[in-house]
Amino acid sequence: MTRDSGKPIVTVLTAPGDAEPPGLDALRAQAEVRFASDEATLNEALPGTRVMMVTDFRTEALAAAWPKADRLEWIHATSAGVDALMFPALTDGPVKVTNAQGIFDRTIAEYVVCTILMFSKDFPNSIRLQQNHQWKHRDTERAQGKRVLIVGAGSIGRQIARLTAAIGLKPHGIARAAREHDPDFEAVHGNDSLTEQLELADFVVVAAPLTAQTEGMFDRAAF
């Protein structure tokens, strides 16, 4: 592997078996681009690397190969969540970590709306009946007026609130602190109200980041 090109080194960490991310041609003109997909290949690629792009949001390879990161300055995750990157050697050091905040808000919100409608309109049984050539009329539920509890009132949760409200649902949020008069939620309740709010919800959406504070919040009492 060339190590004296004079260009800054960028290492791309993908999940094993994933294809090379598109759109890297322009980057290659300005940097030496290396690829890794597991601990072994990352151990080889990391020395001299100044920038990393991580597309595998479940990776454990970086924590294992961290001693090889002798020049690393910046890690960019192409996902919204970065919990796999939050190991002590990284969080306690000077390396900057960024993510793709905002990129997936609309996509995830559309998926949530689709799933709510799927359950309300009983799509699985409709598909099963069609596959069996059974043309059976059934009554389904209306989503309008139902209460959806969105745990996590950040950018993703806020977009979910907007889209669910657009089809007539009543979005309520859970956040670290309660607040009144939110433009996108019927109300935003504090974390200490989770169990109470779960009892009132028709649908529950978890859009909170996985952190030390949120891990385990859906415990036995919540379920």
Mark where each language-model region is:
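N-terminal glycine-/charge-rich "phosphate-binding" loop or analogous flexible N-terminal tail
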Residues: 1-61, 168
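Active-site regions of enzymes building and remodeling cell-envelope glycoconjugates
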Residues: 29-34, 50-51, 94-97, 184-192
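Short acidic active-site motifs
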Residues: 40-41, 61-64, 85-86, 192-196, ...
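Alpha-helix C-terminal capping/helix-to-coil transition sites in glycosyltransferase folds
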Residues: 47-48, 71, 199-200
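Glycine-rich NAD(P)-binding loop of Rossmann-like domains
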Residues: 126-159, 187-188
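NAD(P)-binding Rossmann-fold cofactor-contacting core
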Residues: 166-183
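Rossmann-like adenosine-cofactor binding region
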Residues: 178-223
